[in-house]
Amino acid sequence: MILYEYPFNERVRAYLRLEYLFDRLFYFAREGDARHHQIAVATLFDILDATERTDIKTSVLQDLERQRAALQALRDHPGVAQDALESMLAEMERTVSGLAGQGRAGQPLRENEWLVSLRGRLAVPGGATQVDMPSYHAWQHRTEAVRCADLQTWTAPLRPLHDAVAMALRLLRESGRRSEIVAEQGGYQQMLAGKLFQLLRVWIDPAQGVFPEISANKYMIWIRFSAQDGDAKPQQVARNIDFQMSLCSS
């Protein structure tokens, strides 16, 4: 099944973007060719850009504090596995403390003069060639072990933010209930009855050859399934589509 997610607000949209960027960063920062590490460095700067556009640290801390208060209220509640609850609260405490205990996310990277210079060069198409920045060219020719160690050092200041965003999204996703739905003639809509949701998740069997185009507000969601054929624009299908959906509101 292919999973598609749609955020109901800009805060969750920012979380999803950071999740995507962190996934790409950690993948390309592993052992590999210097070209993989080029992508890792560029993605590192993308994350810095994303964190500068909004106060993501404050947002995710507020979300986790709210979740922690809700979980603490379940202590000694009948039917709740207390060992699992205490384990989750301890994990949440470590995550919150790790992020709250540091300053601005990624600040050491902004104070690294060489990285600041490289970030400026990478903002120019083709600007980090050996002609423009020979020190970066030399770095790419260092041993794989040295490059990996540097990347681990540079990603370390962002780990607390990654862990906090990952936990916030995990708790949000776990709040939804997955259900089987049929989109008649390729379309589906649902009234939300005034309940506030934060994330819509849609699963599609890839064998159906379609993808969802989603729009939503606090009153209603619309899902239209389309297919892409060659170079033509995607076209909405007119057949029934089986899919699964979950509405999340942690």
From Swiss-Prot:
The lineage's top-level taxon is Bacteria
Q: Which InterPro entries match?
A: ZapD (IPR009777), ZapD_C (IPR027462), ZapD_sf (IPR036268)
The main location class comes to: cytoplasm
Its keywords, alphabetically, are:
Cell cycle, Cell division, Cytoplasm, Septation
Kindly give the Pfam families that the UniProt entry links to this protein. ZapD
Which residues, if any, are the signal sequence?
none
Q: Where in the cell is it found?
A: Cytoplasm
- GO CC, one annotated term: cytoplasm
Tell me the protein family, please. Belongs to the ZapD family.
Function, as annotated:
Cell division factor that enhances FtsZ-ring assembly. Directly interacts with FtsZ and promotes bundling of FtsZ protofilaments, with a reduction in FtsZ GTPase activity.
Entry protein name = Cell division protein ZapD
Q: Which organism is it from?
A: Bordetella petrii (strain ATCC BAA-461 / DSM 12804 / CCUG 43448)
Q: What is the lineage of its organism?
A: Bacteria, Pseudomonadati, Pseudomonadota, Betaproteobacteria, Burkholderiales
- Gene that produces this protein: zapD
